Amino acid sequence: MYGTYEEIAGKPAVRFERRYRHPVDRVWRAVTEPEQLAQWFPNTVEVDLREGGHMRFEFPGGEMEPMEGAVTELDPPRRFAFTWGDEHLQIELEPDGDGCRLRFTHVLSTREQAARDAAGWHVCLDRLEALLAGDAGEAPGTEATSEWSEHYEAYQRRGVPAGAPIPGGG
């Protein structure tokens, strides 16, 4: 279930594919509704859920300045794409037997952030799975530091580019 590093149109990206045992509509709500996003996404998110709609991302504890973004593509309940600062994220869902398949792509600003961000998304997507299963625990970033560190090291061993600063000095 590890993500992969690739280049998309010459830009660095990390990509994940996960299968969840929940219908597309249920997963769609978890990836588009701010109350549910707050349970697994690394920021609280305000979103005007329409193409061109404004997005605002606030970091827990005010550790970083809020970021702005916009919805770039919206095809409910199949595709949700948006900018996050100068980066681009895309979430695609498709039915798969008794559940659905999620494809998550994050086009990055720099190669060096790939291992760091892949580890973070790995934790977040695990958290999404827990949320879908009914575990309303804390959002990523609170108790996930050791889990993130393990994944970060694993991504580096897999040859995913690294070297970007680690928030909090981790």
Language-model region placement:
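Residues at helix-coil transition
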Residues: T32-E33, P42, P76, D126, ...
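Beta-strand/loop substructures that line and gate deep hydrophobic ligand-binding cavities in soluble
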Residues: T72, R79-L132
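Residue-level signal for tight coil/turn positions that link beta-strands
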Residues: K11, H22, G52, D75-P77, ...
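Glycine-rich portal/gate segments that line the openings of hydrophobic small-molecule binding cavities
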Residues: Q39-T83, P165-G170
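Intrinsic-disorder/low-complexity, polar/charged segments enriched in Ser/Thr/Lys/Arg/Asp/Glu/Gln
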Residues: A13-E17, H54, P66, R79, ...
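A conserved amphipathic terminal alpha-helix motif
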Residues: L108-G169
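Hydrophobic ligand-binding cavity/cleft-lining segments
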Residues: M1-T44, P167-G170
